[in-house]
Amino acid sequence: MKWCSTYIIIWLAIIFHKFQKSTATASHNIDDILQLKDDTGVITVTADNYPLLSRGVPGYFNILYITMRGTNSNGMSCQLCHDFEKTYHAVADVIRSQAPQSLNLFFTVDVNEVPQLVKDLKLQNVPHLVVYPPAESNKQSQFEWKTSPFYQYSLVPENAENTLQFGDFLAKILNISITVPQAFNVQEFVYYFVACMVVFIFIKKVILPKVTNKWKLFSMILSLGILLPSITGYKFVEMNAIPFIARDAKNRIMYFSGGSGWQFGIEIFSVSLMYIVMSALSVLLIYVPKISCVSEKMRGLLSSFLACVLFYFFSYFISCYLIKNPGYPIVF
């Protein structure tokens, strides 16, 4: 019995020693890998450290950007690679600063510097952006970049510089919340500024001088301003925390959602504007025939013109509604 107890104690001591040694080795490997990060949190893969890095780190997401900084054998460079690399480093820096608790490692590998990666992944072109999720604890020893499953980000020239789209892609996979800063778009600002100034000057110089009762006009505008958001879905947008402007994969503004049970914030204003225009045209159609200072022939021409414009706007309204409800039967 005494010898049996001694054997059990020795066996437990050996197991504890092996566990402590393996834990220390794993910790040592993590520390060694983390020291390779640059200022934005990205690790550059070389031919020397590739065997170590390609085995991954337990519990960490591996975000791998495969690029070509120089030229290929034909002397051609990869412009898409250069364009996306700025986006890659920018988003990596945002995640490093805003979500330090997230267990992830960003890697950049140049196919000219690490040809073994090209053979392992059987690459035919560049660039590629892949994300390896952490391996299960019992399968960590089998984890390798060349054999493990991954998520792939679609890289095309249209989204190469879109930090918001790439940040959203990673945030969903890593299950984190980040805010990607956007560069100030001068061209877009000038466009909206000029448009607003034209409308403002037109109202000030043309509309207001002809208004005798300005208080009544402002009261009507205020009433419409309160009424229209209510009937066009402002509360729905507010309750569901829907963003005001949504963009598609090509960074274009989506003015209408593809379903009658959902809407974007911008739809409040687009639908309100269509209601206002059609209401104004209907009112003008009623009052134009009653204008005495205009000849009967001119009143007839104006009425016909307003009717055509109203028909056009209603047809446009129906075409927008078909985006929401493609099965709507009345189309003209």
From Swiss-Prot:
Domain Thioredoxin: 35-162
Its membrane topology: Multi-pass membrane protein
Annotated transmembrane regions: 189-209, 217-237, 268-288, 303-323
Keywords tagged on the record: Disulfide bond, Endoplasmic reticulum, Membrane, Signal, Transmembrane, Transmembrane helix
Pathway: Protein modification; protein glycosylation
Topology Lumenal: residue spans: 25-188, 238-267, 324-332
Location(s), subcellular: Endoplasmic reticulum membrane
Gene Ontology CC terms: endoplasmic reticulum; endoplasmic reticulum membrane; oligosaccharyltransferase complex
Highest taxon above the source species: Eukaryota
Entries under Pfam families matching the protein: OST3_OST6
Cytoplasmic side, ranges: 210-216, 289-302
Cleaved signal peptide residues: 1-24
GO BP, sorted A to Z: protein N-linked glycosylation; protein N-linked glycosylation via asparagine
Disulfide bonds, paired cysteine numbers: C78-C81
Subunit structure: Component of the oligosaccharyltransferase (OST) complex, which appears to exist in two assemblies comprising OST1, OST2, OST4, OST5, STT3, SWP1, WPB1, and either OST3 or OST6. OST assembly occurs through the formation of 3 subcomplexes. Subcomplex 1 contains OST1 and OST5, subcomplex 2 contains STT3, OST3, and OST4, and subcomplex 3 contains OST2, WBP1, and SWP1.
Role: Subunit of the oligosaccharyl transferase (OST) complex that catalyzes the initial transfer of a defined glycan (Glc(3)Man(9)GlcNAc(2) in eukaryotes) from the lipid carrier dolichol-pyrophosphate to an asparagine residue within an Asn-X-Ser/Thr consensus motif in nascent polypeptide chains, the first step in protein N-glycosylation. N-glycosylation occurs cotranslationally and the complex associates with the Sec61 complex at the channel-forming translocon complex that mediates protein translocation across the endoplasmic reticulum (ER). All subunits are required for a maximal enzyme activity.
Record-stated family: Belongs to the OST3/OST6 family.
Further remark: Present with 1080 molecules/cell in log phase SD medium.
Name of the protein: Dolichyl-diphosphooligosaccharide--protein glycosyltransferase subunit OST6
Encoding gene (name): OST6
